[in-house]
């Protein structure tokens, strides 16, 4: 498979490795992106897979709860300035309340629903806001979560909605605990609640990479397995909420802290505005020149 410049660029964004290292990795694995990431990690060139940090959109994440239901959603705008606009913030709240009440299957279904039982659809309502605010606005995603009577919701919005987190804490009515765990999730960004949620494929892949790393470091075969298990524990600490040092008390793990409160973490959802969408990057000099020529 031919290795293209766009493939090299994508691998650089995902790993932070140099251009030539990325090209060599892709050539070695015949263009397979996942294998190229593992190749770079095994060689010690990329410490870990990372997503491109560039953010494509501005906007807000928000959480609304009502009884045993809650919704977390992300609504995008073109600029951070509009994200602070009162009309935009009101739109975000209206959309959250609509989704919580109607529980559409997905974004497409939500946009087609009548808004508040009227003649206009949710998309029509967004279009009205676009005309008023003067920027493209879009409902990007949402998750509706339900809990049992004995559970409690927690929510946390960082930087006014740049990051939004919704947690469900089991066997507890401790709202402060639920919010603290949401705050931790916002700050540390775990992928899973516990090790039980990590699939065998993910663990096997990580174990293979760690083993190859140790062998490439020249470690003796007889101690490689022990090293791998130790490093695998570090991996779980990076991705599993309950294994992480609690952000408000680094001397104890989240799991131990929650257990001390006779509670459990059932689930969490974390939205960071614009994650996974590449933002258009304008050349500043060209932008200035374009204004001068007008």
From Swiss-Prot:
Keyword Cytoplasm: yes
Pfam family, one: EF_TS
Entry keyword Protein biosynthesis: yes
Keywords linked to the UniProt accession: Cytoplasm, Elongation factor, Protein biosynthesis
GO CC list: cytoplasm
Annotated region (Involved in Mg(2+) ion dislocation from EF-Tu), positions in chain: 79-82
Molecular function as annotated in GO: translation elongation factor activity
PROSITE patterns with a match to the protein in the record: EF_TS_1, EF_TS_2
Compartment(s) where it occurs, according to its Swiss-Prot or TrEMBL record: Cytoplasm
Family stated for the protein in its record: Belongs to the EF-Ts family.
Described function: Associates with the EF-Tu.GDP complex and induces the exchange of GDP to GTP. It remains bound to the aminoacyl-tRNA.EF-Tu.GTP complex up to the GTP hydrolysis stage on the ribosome.
Protein's name according to its UniProt entry: Elongation factor Ts
């Amino acid at each position: 498979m031919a290795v293209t410049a766009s493939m090299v660029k994508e691998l650089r964004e995902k790993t932070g490795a140099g251009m030539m290292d990325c090209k060599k990795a892709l050539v070695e694995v015949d263009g397979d992106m996942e294998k190229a990431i593992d190749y770079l990690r095994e060689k010690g060139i990329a410490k870990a897979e990372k997503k491109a940090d560039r953010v494509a959109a501005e906007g807000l994440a928000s959480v609304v709860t009502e009884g045993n239901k809650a919704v977390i959603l992300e609504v995008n705008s073109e600029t951070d300035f509009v994200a602070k606009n009162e009309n935009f913030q009101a739109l975000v709240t209206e959309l959250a309340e609509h989704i919580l009440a109607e529980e559409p299957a997905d974004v497409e279904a939500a946009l087609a629903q009548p808004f508040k039982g009227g003649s206009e659809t949710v998309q029509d309502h967004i279009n009205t806001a676009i005309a008023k605010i003067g920027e493209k606005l879009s409902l990007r995603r949402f998750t509706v979560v339900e809990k049992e009577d004995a559970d409690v919701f927690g929510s946390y919005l960082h930087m006014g909605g740049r990051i939004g987190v919704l947690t469900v804490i089991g066997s507890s009515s401790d709202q402060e605990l639920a919010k603290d765990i949401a705050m931790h999730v916002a700050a540390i960004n775990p992928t899973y609640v516990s090790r039980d949620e990590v699939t065998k494929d993910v663990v096997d892949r990580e174990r293979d990479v760690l083993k190859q790393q140790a062998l490439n470091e020249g470690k003796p075969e007889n101690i490689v397995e022990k090293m791998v298990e130790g490093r695998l524990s570090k991996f779980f600490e990076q991705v599993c909420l309950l294994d992480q040092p609690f952000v408000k008390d680094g001397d104890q793990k989240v799991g131990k802290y929650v257990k001390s409160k006779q509670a459990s973490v059932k689930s969490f959802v974390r939205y960071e505005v614009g994650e996974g969408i590449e933002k258009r990057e304008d050349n500043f000099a060209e932008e200035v020149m374009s204004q001068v020529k007008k």
